Amino acid sequence: MTDKTRIDELVTGLRQGPLEVRRKATAELGASGEAAVAPLIAAMLEGDNDIRWYAARALVQIGEPAIGPLLDAMRAAGDHDFRRYAMAALAGMGDAAVKPLVALIENADPVLQPFAATALMRIGEPAVEPLLRLMESPDPKTQERAALLLWKMGETGAGPLTEALITGSRSANNK
């Protein structure tokens, strides 16, 4: 665990340091855990895309504790570039981010849905089953969003989507 003073020093290095300092700061911030989440998100909100890239990499290392705060910041921030880098961080977290990202698709969050869709496509295989479950929703729009996302995943999602549609068609015909 890294204390607040050290985290602040590392974030300053991330913002102002030469390449090697930024790389080391990214690694140490990523290893700092939850205490570094808010300062990293603040750096992403205030910084340029280089800083966002390094901060996103550190957030990927931190993983699950960063998911909720990242989603909250994405909702609050109107900056498209910030949202894009935050989405990349969520995609880099893989399995841990699937459930909250699928919830954004299910709830048709107008602000974050496109970012969630992109992240889920990047995550790939771990997102397939949760999206297949969304296709069982009573809401046709939710079914449509899930099917479209599976299709856009390419081979990873299209095969399971096709099988689900065939199985669903058979079940409907047997009623």
Residue map of PLM features:
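Structural detector for internal amphipathic alpha-helices that build alpha-solenoid repeat scaffolds
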Residues: M1-K4, L19-E34, A42, D50-E64, ...
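Solenoid-like repeat scaffolds
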Residues: A76-G78, E136, R170
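N-terminal intrinsically disordered, low-complexity tails
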Residues: E9-T12
